[in-house]
Regions:
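NAD(P)-binding Rossmann-fold cofactor-contacting core
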Residues: 20-42
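Conserved N-terminal Rossmann-fold NAD(P)-binding element of oxidoreductases
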Residues: 2-6
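Adenosine-phosphate binding glycine-rich loop
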Residues: 80-173
Length: 173
């Protein structure tokens, strides 16, 4: 079961794709009418926007608001994985440590949703062929695996590992 927070273009797309694969979904969105319509369309459970953070599921996928992973909300999480497209999900850097301490696998937002910036950067640099963009996007799952492996091996939160990797990639680490 996947708990999806946000049912706009990103969250709605995630929900439709997962539903097509047979996943059971719990959906929540700020736009209640849109969330209700999508839940009915997909045969998903409708949850309150605040309550979605407490739904027991395999994955919480935040796809709307930033700063939703706070000290209080992390304590209430009932998922082993947090992976979604919302920007700046961690309210503070300390929240990355809190998620790590809870044993929750966290996919840092700027890694999981890097496809957009990859496309823009390659286009800006004049290297934006569809094939090049897709080849770079296909590297994202491997990067996540590297982040999680390093996090596990070093005991360092995935958010910190990802920050270090990003700094190294852009020549600042």
């Amino acid at each position: 079961r996947i708990a999806i927070q946000g049912v706009g273009s990103v969250g709605g797309g995630v929900a439709r794709r997962l539903a097509a694969e047979g996943a059971k979904l719990a959906l929540a969105g700020v736009n209640l009418a849109r969330a209700k319509a999508l839940a009915e369309e997909l045969g998903a459970e409708l949850a309150d926007s605040a309550a979605i953070m407490e739904v027991e599921a395999d994955v919480l996928s935040p796809n709307a608001l930033g700063a939703i992973l706070t000290e209080a909300s992390i304590e209430k999480l009932r998922v082993p994985i947090v992976a979604g497209g919302a920007n700046n999900q961690l309210a503070t850097a300390a929240d990355g440590q809190r998620i790590h301490d809870r044993g929750i696998v966290y996919a840092p937002d700027y890694v999981i949703n890097a496809g957009g910036i990859i496309n823009v950067a390659l286009e800006y640099l004049g290297q934006g062929s569809r094939e090049e963009v897709e080849s770079r996007i296909h590297l994202i799952p491997g990067r996540l695996a590297e982040i999680w492996a390093e996090s596990k091996a070093s005991g360092t939160p995935a958010s910190v590992v990802a920050d270090r990797m990003a700094q190294k990639l852009i020549g600042r680490g």
